[in-house]
């Protein structure tokens, strides 16, 4: 049986922290930033943790395979 391969798209979008949580980037922070106010663009450049437990289990399976 061959080794399981990790999902390369998920590996580029999500990172696992040392405690096992999943870190992700926020959407809408890459272009059309002149329309968005400064407070919003600062918030969009911060990374955040994934809070959906069912998605977290799926993503862990994809990136830690």
UniProtKB/Swiss-Prot annotation:
The keyword Transcription does not apply. GO terms for biological process: translation. Pfam families: Ribosomal_L35p. Residues 36-45 have a biased composition (Basic residues). One of its GO terms (molecular function) is structural constituent of ribosome. Keywords: Ribonucleoprotein, Ribosomal protein. PROSITE patterns: RIBOSOMAL_L35. SUPFAM superfamilies: L35p-like (SSF143034). Residues 28-53 are annotated as: Disordered. The keyword Phosphoprotein does not apply. GO terms for cellular component: cytosolic large ribosomal subunit. Belongs to the bacterial ribosomal protein bL35 family. HAMAP family: Ribosomal_bL35. This is Large ribosomal subunit protein bL35. The gene is rpmI.
């Amino acid at each position: 049986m061959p080794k399981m391969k990790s999902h390369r798209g998920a590996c580029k979008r999500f990172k696992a922290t040392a405690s096992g949580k999943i870190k992700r980037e926020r959407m809408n922070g890459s272009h059309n930033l002149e329309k968005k106010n400064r407070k919003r663009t600062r918030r969009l450049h911060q990374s955040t943790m994934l809070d959906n437990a069912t998605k977290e289990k799926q993503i862990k399976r994809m990136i830690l395979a």
